Amino acid sequence: MYQVKTLNKISPVGLAHLTESYILTDKTEDADAILVRSQDMHEMEFSEKLEAIARAGAGVNNIPLDRCAKAGIVVFNTPGANANAVKELVLCGMLLASRNVPAALTWAKGLSEDVSKTVEKGKSQFAGHEILGKTLGIVGLGAIGRKVAEAAKALGMNIVGYDPYYVSGGEGLTVYPDLAEMLPLCDIVTLHLPANDATRGMVNKEFLASMKDGAILLNFSRDKLVNDVDLLVALESGKLTQYVTDFPNDNLIGREHITLLPHLGASTAEAEDNCATMAVMELRDYFENGNIINSVNFPKVDMGPLGDLRRLAFFVRDMENPVEEMMNMLSAAEIKVSKIQAGRRAADGIAYVLAEVETTDASNLLFGGETGAKILRHREIGK
């Protein structure tokens, strides 16, 4: 029986996929697994019992990934599960900004007398632009970026993109190897990147200076991507005409030409259901089969569904060749291995090894000696 703790409200549609082998617990210290959305976990103490964390969403900035890896705790996310929800809001933001809708709404709320005449006289100040034929630049061509490209193309836009890791999926867009080459072409730029050391603050004065005069910038990705000081300078100078973001902060509130949304990107019933379901199924695959799929702190290890045999899972450190060393250890214990896979972290060498074995009893597996000292944690998996 596995105990699961939820740190945020998790969709009951997803939780319904937990079988009788799983129970929900209110006690974090008793949890074998944690389901989380946005709660910050960096200051949390993790019990030795905790084996996995599943983030019902894509971003994992709220989870201490390296600390989890060193403790043999696998962290999963749900890439693509909320992609359609974010895509739709990006399109909404693009249309709102292009047609000056936010400013027009604010103005219209203040109308009082002689409304018809006032509207006819004042509407011209909000004249905007159609997106048909305009060029959209997509920075980051993952699941969301690709969906945005497909939808914007269907609306008659020209699509260009930048992503150093892009592999064509038939989207029919032009991908540039250099941002400085792409940005001057774009009427609208939308960001779809993770926040990490390479991307944090990347939208700075150099980035903004490369953009087309009068362009619109959309950020439905991460707030840390944009340098607010440089952004405000670009808006005040007219270099940018509009900034739409899903991440309000104190620097941006009350500013002209900025549309702030309260982090609505994945806030749809459908996205929450999809993310929760995917997160639960990832946890089940890990606990029931030993597979690691869509982890953000360990490489993929996938043996498919468990059959009649048993599996042994190990987290190990300081092994140049985890498969070879674990094979030797299993062989010494007279455990016959049917198949074995391993995924090793480049950053610190911590690896996950999954072995399918032809035995019903692994009790003779000893953890002494040099190899045993390298094992961080282990478990048996069987039906």
Q: Can you say where each PLM-predicted feature lies in the sequence?
A:
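An N-terminal-biased, well-structured beta-alpha scaffold segment characteristic
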Residues: M1-T78, P184, N204-A209, I340, ...
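Rossmann-like adenosine-cofactor binding region
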Residues: Q39-M44, V160, P164-L252, S267
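Phosphate-binding beta-alpha-beta segment of Rossmann-like dinucleotide-binding domains, i.e.
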Residues: P79-T135, N294-S295
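Oxidoreductase and adenylate-handling cofactor-binding alpha/beta cores
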Residues: K87-T106, A152-M157, M278-N291, M327-S331
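Glycine-rich Rossmann-fold phosphate-binding loop(s) that bind the pyrophosphate
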Residues: L141-G142
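N-terminal Rossmann-fold NAD(P) dinucleotide-binding loop
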Residues: G145-R146
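Rossmann-like dinucleotide-binding domain for NAD(H)/NADP(H)
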Residues: N158, D213-R311, F315-R317, N328-M329, ...
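Short amphipathic alpha-helix segments
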Residues: M319-K339
